[in-house]
Amino acid sequence: MAAWGPAAAAPLLRGSRGLPLWHCAQRMFASQTEGELKVTQVLKEKFPRATAIQVTDISGGCGAMYEIKIESEEFKEKRTVQQHQMVNQALKEEIKGMHGLRIFTSVPKC
């Protein structure tokens, strides 16, 4: 029985995330996706004192799952769960269209 798709023609080498290596290479050098830009913009508006914001689409480019790293003075003296709640609240509209979200928050070091 013949399989459908390009994988049927030649075996694909897969990277650590299970994606074809050519896809990983394309994504590594590509600029931010539309979804990454949108989430970054919302976070910049909601956390104007953030010293670092990094948004990465970890779903392979389809926009279903993101990893967010944000460093902001606004997280000072808040527990991790409270920091994550702040990020979730800021992105409540965007989250409706996502499958998952990884959040890493921190406070700038003096």
UniProtKB/Swiss-Prot annotation:
Keywords: Mitochondrion. One of its GO terms (biological process) is glucose metabolic process. It is found in: Mitochondrion. Its main location: mitochondrion. It holds the Pfam family BolA. InterPro entries: BolA (IPR002634), BolA-like_sf (IPR036065), Mt_Fe-S_assembly_factor (IPR052275). GO terms for cellular component: iron-sulfur cluster assembly complex; mitochondrion; nuclear body. Interacts with NFU1. Belongs to the BolA/IbaG family. Acts as a mitochondrial iron-sulfur (Fe-S) cluster assembly factor that facilitates (Fe-S) cluster insertion into a subset of mitochondrial proteins. Probably acts together with NFU1. This is BolA-like protein 3.
